[in-house]
From Swiss-Prot:
Ranges for domain Guanylate cyclase: 103-257
Binding site for Mg(2+): D108, D151
Membrane topology of this protein: Multi-pass membrane protein
Note describing how the cofactor binds: Binds 1 Mg(2+) ion per subunit.
Residue intervals on the Extracellular side: 1-59
Principal location class: membrane
Protein name, per record: Receptor-type adenylate cyclase
Any GO MF annotation of the entry: adenylate cyclase activity
Organism domain of life: Eukaryota
Amino acid sequence: VDTAEKLSKNGCASNYGATQISVWSMARALNASIPPLTNPMTPSMTFRNSNAGRISGVALVGVIIGGALALFLVVALGVVPYFFLHNTRDNNLAPKELTDPVTLIFTDIESSTALWAAHPELMPDAVATHHRLIRSLIGRYGCYEVKTVGDSFMIASKSPFAAVQLAQELQLCFLHHDWGTNAIDESYQQLEQQRAEEDAKYTPPTARLDLKVYSRLWNGLRVRVGIHTGLCDIRRDEVTKGYDYYGRTSNMAARTESVGNGGQVLMTTAAYMSLSAEEREQIDVTALGDVPLRGVAKPVEMYQLNAVPGRTFAGLRLEHELLNDDEDQTTTSCSDHSSSRTDLSVAAQTIAASLQSLLGTFTPAQRQKALIPFCERWRVPLPQKVGNVWDNDGCQEAIRRVAAKVGRVMDFGTRKASSSVTSLERGGSLFSAGGATVATVASSSNFSCVDGRCGTVQLIDLENDSTTS
């Protein structure tokens, strides 16, 4: 018993609940008449597990793995859906009733093609900031992002006033944002100076402003905005799971945006009159009168929202200016007007001659197939066609439009690279949408950048090259 108690105290023995324990002799085990050596007793022994309170190695590994899985599950069920929903359009905000007027907003960056050519290292971050700022305003004012096309936004709103507030706040946000560079503003001013040199009647609205005055009115990317209100053909896209808006209202909103200048907000009389009298008192507008819009039978009464008091703008970019403008177009419709080759700059004539020489042996269908990527890449309107294939005039018009657009960008890049050069002495390589060089113009070579692509480029001597037409 003493030994048992001793062992029990040392934790080396236990009775596991046994009671009435006695010590028998071997004789007692063989003969029950022989009494036990000790009387039965129940020792005060308790079971004690020496590993109690400790976690084994296997259990520890299991706890670690289980904790990691639990953390992963929290991330998967919480954080991932948050980011997914954050970047997904909220269809609850989409106007869906066919009988309710919808206010549509179109936006576009002024001179984005020229900016990409001049500042390929800055524009990716600038455009990403542009998208982030606009999307934050869409959420703030309960509007709906319909789509983005390049650097253009199409936005729908159930409330006309919310749309107007968004457009006004957009201009203020861009004005007060720290873009981290003055290069974009300098490029806009250079573009205005270039146009003033080409057109004696044109007065640059910002290029000659005092620096302090300029900084109060302008900063960074300039975005033009057009607003129109009306009934729409509303459809849900089964692929994107979002809503889109078709018909006269969307066309009118796009046309309204297209005639504006960067930093300018235009709204049709339909949008303005959709506001209540109290709402109209909260905004500052300037009546612009009737404005002719491409594809619209009658002139449309237009208002300018003075989002940034003190800003002045050039005249509206009306139909006769659209085709030769260096801006990116948000529509793909064609203008009925065209210009002869003599209207093109030297650089544009060089590009046109190169394309004509390169594609001259192609069939009309082959020329159309080759030219469409250029039109899409440089965002120029496609020419009208009869049937499924462009005729010769259509192909020539497509070449002229592409050449006019690329030529203006090259002119801008040349002027920016060397302010002392008064006539175009450099050219560039014309690139396909996939990045392959399609046509290289030949003669004196210089270094230039076109739409963010830099390299040694050459110019064709139109007077000495017998292959040009």
